[in-house]
């Protein structure tokens, strides 16, 4: 089961994409929705609104605990901001909001991302952040004009762009592969009985 934080933003498009890839999807709005998840997507949207929703619903510490448990987490655009030092503090990064400019400055780029086979990833940037500061355990996967826009630290992958808008499924496929591997390692007996 993969969760999609559904407080605001493009959560429906992420859920649809994950379902099309064969995943069972749960919209996450309150802490109990995090129970039993094998992966989580924190989608783009408006980071201040998402922050207020997380605070209102008491989700901050449960989200931190989920990430600390090793569950794969994938954040896009505002999701990158939500996971940085200043917000949930899950990643050792500092982000700059709207780093590429306002919506009128939206753009697309092709990015080579390690671990993603095939042609470059088509990245759609809309009021996108970039990473200003990375801790030493953070791996930079892609950059635009020298600014990191895709980074990973352990089980958490964040990107500054919107794969769901471009119809780019490979990053979601990566999350599902990681979730499947985690499920296999953490619940081998349960999986063995299902066969």
Model-predicted regions and their roles:
Residues 7, 78, 161:
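Cofactor-binding loop segments of dinucleotide-utilizing enzymes, especially the Rossmann-like FAD-
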Residues 25-26, 73, 156:
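Hydrophobic anchor at the start of a short beta-strand
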Residues 42, 75, 159:
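Redox-cofactor binding/interface segments in oxidoreductases and associated redox assembly factors
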Residues 98-195:
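Amide-donor transfer/coupling interface in amidating biosynthetic enzymes
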Residues 46-112:
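Cysteine-nucleophile active-site neighborhood
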């Amino acid at each position: 089961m993969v969760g999609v934080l559904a407080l605001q933003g493009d959560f429906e498009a992420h859920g649809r994409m994950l379902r099309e890839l064969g995943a069972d999807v749960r919209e996450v709005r309150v802490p109990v929705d995090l129970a039993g998840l094998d992966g989580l997507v924190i989608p783009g949207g408006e980071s201040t609104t998402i922050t207020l929703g997380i605070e209102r619903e008491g989700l901050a510490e449960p989200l931190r605990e989920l990430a600390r448990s090793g569950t794969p987490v994938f954040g896009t655009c505002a999701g990158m901001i939500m996971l940085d030092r200043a917000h949930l503090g899950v990643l050792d990064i500092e982000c700059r909001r709207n780093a590429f400019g306002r919506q009128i400055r939206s753009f697309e780029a092709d990015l080579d991302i390690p671990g993603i086979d095939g042609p470059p990833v088509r990245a759609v940037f809309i009021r996108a952040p970039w990473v200003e500061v990375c801790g030493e355990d953070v791996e930079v996967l892609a950059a635009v004009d020298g600014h990191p826009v895709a980074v990973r630290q352990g089980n958490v992958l964040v990107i500054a762009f919107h794969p769901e808008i471009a119809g780019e499924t490979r990053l979601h496929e990566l999350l599902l592969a990681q979730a499947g591997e985690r499920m296999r390692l953490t619940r081998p007996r349960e999986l063995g009985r299902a066969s």
